Amino acid sequence: MAEAFNDKRLTGSKAERYAQVAEEIAAVLAGEPNPTARMATVAAMLAATFEHYFWTGFYVVDPDKPDELVVGPYQGTLGCLRIPFGRGVCGAAAASRQTQLVADVHAFPGHIACDSRSASEIVVPVFAPDGRLIAVFDVDSETPAAFDAVDADGLAAILSQAFGRPS
């Protein structure tokens, strides 16, 4: 059994905290092949580390409807159950296979308001080692413009490490 995660040990700049939690996540995930367990762990550890995270979790590509995302492991209030590719911030990330960094979600065309308290959002695509899109990782904040390139780079590195595709 892994040592209990203590987010209070993580200090320094945001970039340093991403690097520290990446090491912690890698240690906890070592030897665990199950993608659901890996997703649940990543979501929980990141939510515990960053105070500006309001909702943190995965939307997984539905194998029965490959142009649709279905809610996966997350931390936070009730998530939207399904999101079509191309709709909202998560759907845009899935369709474009590119990170979406949104300072004001209310100004984003087609934004899906799963929780009206969300003000800004970052969504990072998650790829299998063979390059297939398997999910998107969604983080919302109640603070406008809460995310920047440091978050995008830190999350991309953690997700690449956890799910096998180099960034």
Q: Which ranges hold each PLM region?
A:
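A short acidic/glycine-rich loop-to-helix N-cap element
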Residues: 144-151
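Intrinsically disordered, low-complexity terminal regulatory regions
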Residues: 1-78, 157-167
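Short hydrophobic/aromatic beta-strand element in the GNAT-like acyltransferase core
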Residues: 55, 123, 136
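Short loop/turn motifs at secondary-structure junctions and domain boundaries
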Residues: 50, 114-118
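Regulatory sensory and allosteric helical modules in signal-transduction proteins
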Residues: 61-64, 68-114
